[in-house]
Amino acid sequence: MNICLFLPEEIGMPLALKDDRAEHILKILHKKTGDTFTAGIVGGASGTAKITGITDEGIFFDFTASGDGKPLYPLKMIVGFPRPIQLKRLLRDVAALGVCEVHLTGTELGEKSYMQSTLLEKGNAYKMLFDGTVQAGGTKIPGIFLHKTLSQCVSAVCGSRQENQADFSAPAAGKILLALDNVRPSQSLGDALGRFHGNLLSRGVVAAIGSERGWTDKERDFLAQSGFALCSMGCRIMRTETAATVAGAIILNEMGVMGNDERQN
């Protein structure tokens, strides 16, 4: 737990001793009255909390904001619904990277039963995103969305074909659309990103990653017709959650955000 996150209404209220955050503060960090710890407001500012007292009622603290909570980056990820255990790791990792949205979608080769997973119920998926955000020391939690089909997903995420393109000669206007595919790629992911000459951060990127069995030819055709460039990350076949994390890191590095020192946030 690299930051202790609170809802806005929790600021100014004692933190119950049985709360997981309180146990971390007292048993892991070994904090006592007068000490400080890194804290933040979910979706808001980050800063420092100073413990003003510890009683049976809980931990009393004062919060002082000092940072913006590490804003999320303009990278949206479309992911063919993976196995639930893979999805847990995927959500934690992409949240830690700072992806702004995760769109889970059914695919032609995807296992339909995965979409019925209880991971999407009772806030379990949100908890994975929350954990990844805390790991990164941020306060902004990525959005998560579920779509029955790839067509519905692309329509919801990308809008019209005219507003987005993978055309490298196109003006810096719409989102940059990239689909990971090791069967029929037109170029490598690195080459595709390199062609945008610094426009990645201003335009934003949508990266699509298939389920564990990949895309069908019909889906590849649909993605290409929708403006996605089919890109490879080499000849090695990766698990869905690995591909999502690796692709996210490569894209964010090309955006120029991976080298920025955000410790003050």
Where are the language model's segments positioned?
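A C-terminal functional module that forms or caps the active site or interfaces directly
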Residues: 205-218, 222
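Short loop-to-alpha-helix "cap/lid" segments that border enzyme active sites
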Residues: 167-168, 186-199
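Short Gly/Pro-enriched loop/turn and capping motifs at secondary-structure junctions
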Residues: 183-186, 212-216, 237-238
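Structured adenosyl-cofactor binding patch, chiefly the S-adenosyl-L-methionine
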Residues: 217-265
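Residue-level preference for the first positions of well-ordered beta-strands
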Residues: 176-177, 202-208
